[in-house]
From Swiss-Prot:
Gene3D superfamilies: Ribosomal protein L17. The lineage of its organism: Bacteria, Pseudomonadati, Pseudomonadota, Alphaproteobacteria, Rickettsiales. This is Large ribosomal subunit protein bL17. One of its GO terms (molecular function) is structural constituent of ribosome. The gene is rplQ. HAMAP family: Ribosomal_bL17. It comes from Rickettsia prowazekii (strain Madrid E).
Length: 136
């Protein structure tokens, strides 16, 4: 029985999973959009949204808490100074997952995870990229 089991194993050890989520969170914060497999994107969403919710009320304790989850100071600065302010009035739902077909080698489902109301010029338009991949 799977009762009260949260999250996905992603077929890796717990330390690998924690490191992977932290690294993916840093990439998402810096680039505001990343391409990954669908299960990883679904695991990353609550992880990053919890960090942004904390960052809405910035103080030293919050900064240290976020820094304990992700070890990149640039990403922590951006979460607290930019993303926390950007989503101050939004009660959750800071990210969106856009499905983008399947990977060529192993047919793994691929998705883009991005911030809602992100800077479009920071990276390519996810909807155009998804449509181009579907056509190919």
């Amino acid at each position: 029985m799977r009762h009260r089991i949260k999250g996905r194993r992603l077929n890796v050890t717990s330390s690998h999973r924690q490191s992977m989520l932290a690294n993916m969170a840093v990439s998402l914060v810096i680039h505001e959009q990343i391409k990954t497999t669908l299960p990883k994107a679904k695991e990353l969403r609550p992880y990053i949204e919890a960090l942004i919710t904390k960052a809405k009320k910035p103080d030293l304790a919050v900064r240290r808490s976020v820094l304990s989850k992700i070890k990149d100071k640039r990403a922590v600065e951006k979460i607290i100074n930019i993303l926390g302010v950007r989503y101050k009035d939004r009660p959750g739902g800071y990210t969106r997952i856009v499905k983008s077909g399947f990977r060529y080698g192993d047919l793994a489902p691929i998705a883009y995870i991005e911030f809602v109301d992100r800077d479009i010029n920071a990276k390519g338009n996810v909807h155009q990229d998804a449509n181009e991949e579907i056509k190919n």
